[in-house]
Amino acid sequence: MPSVLWILFDGGGDRPNGGKTPFHVAFKPTIDYLTSLGSCGLLDPISPGVRPGSDTAHLALFGYDPYKYYTGRGAFEALGAGIELRPGDVAFRTNLATVDSSGVVIDRRAGRYIAPEETRAVEEVMAKIGDEVAKRYGVEVVYKSTVEHRGVLVLRGPVSHKVSDTDPHKVGMPVAKAAPLGNDREAALTAEVVNYITARFTEAAGGLEINKARAASGRPPINAILLRGGGYMPAIEPVAEKYRVKAAAIAGVALIRGVAKAVGMDVYTAQGLGGTKDDVFDHAVKLAVELMGKYDVVFLHVKGTDSTSHDGDFQGKVAVIERLDKALAPYLDHLLKNYFIVTSDHATPVSIREHTGEPVPLTLYGPDVVPDDVAKFSELTCWRGALGRLRGIDIMPILASYLGLSEKFGE
């Protein structure tokens, strides 16, 4: 039986820059060849004009209505980081960041790269702050770094997810104060705890040896922690029950691993796949091809296209696309016997450096997929394809249908 290899370029969609996009410019003969034999279209990850987060977009792409199942990013980040959430736990996505002397954010990612010894120093600080919070508020704090500047913070105790973010989501703005979004005592306590952690981290960071070393090398200090997406783990019907599809995901980023786990996918990682713009994909693609013999759908997440977009790096984004395509090339004959789908979870235009709401290109190849006349995978070409304009939530039912796994609606 054939299976599906699904390549997802995170933030891969873009706007024309000088009349061209990274997908259009990139030399990607394998993807373009399969595109020429398949059917193309445009994809609204959620719905037209909606700027998706990576969390809500992946829920939709995996076949789950985010308006029904989304309870906050933090829970998926925690699950992907290997933290098993208990009932009542509230989790947040964190960014290590840089602020100036007045508390204004000047870099939401503290230069993005965080060395292993810097990660250890941050985790030691957070452990001490956690002890203070436990004594002061009776709330347990669990903190874990994930990739680069990213991390997860879990609060355990009489807490609530109904608090606002401290992350201002843009530079040039002060770190926000968490505020309760409800009238309950738990929300008020949670906001107080979050604000305490935020203030204490900046106080403690001033004396860290790692920041002296970073200053000496011209790197921005790690002197703030930004929290966002407070949430709890929702109850989700596994994808194997909802769509009768046995699925696996290969990802280096905690958020994507967490969403995949939450919907019941088996999750793998691979050498070279760390969730950065410098990822190398040979081992990940090899693993994906091997897993195709065991699963109906194998999903491979490529983070680098989003990271380079947020950095405004057009050529870097092109390079990520080309590295992935080069890794696919040795397996072309195998791919031709199976199904192959490529798309993005959202657009992150290099010129904007943020998620935007326009549709992204989509291509679907299969031995029995009716081809159209599109020969190149790009925003500038896929709009002419036979698939038309789809939503993210349409993808899994389409794949299940081609695999012969979907149930008939009606008699």
UniProtKB/Swiss-Prot annotation:
InterPro entries referenced in this protein's UniProt entry, alphabetically: Alkaline_phosphatase_core_sf, ApgAM_prokaryotes, Metalloenzyme, Pglycerate_mutase_ApgM, Pglycerate_mutase_ApgM_sf
Pathways per UniProt: Carbohydrate degradation; glycolysis; pyruvate from D-glyceraldehyde 3-phosphate: step 3/5
Domain of life of the source: Archaea
Enzymatic reactions: (2R)-2-phosphoglycerate = (2R)-3-phosphoglycerate
Keyword field: Glycolysis, Isomerase
Signal peptide as annotated in the record: none
EC number of the protein: 5.4.2.12
CDD domains: iPGM_like
Gene Ontology terms, MF aspect: metal ion binding; phosphoglycerate mutase activity
GO biological process, one term: glycolytic process
NCBIfam families for this protein: apgM, PRK04024.1
Protein family: Belongs to the BPG-independent phosphoglycerate mutase family. A-PGAM subfamily.
Protein task: Catalyzes the interconversion of 2-phosphoglycerate and 3-phosphoglycerate.
HAMAP family: ApgM_A (MF_01402_A)
Record-given protein name: 2,3-bisphosphoglycerate-independent phosphoglycerate mutase
Primary gene name: apgM
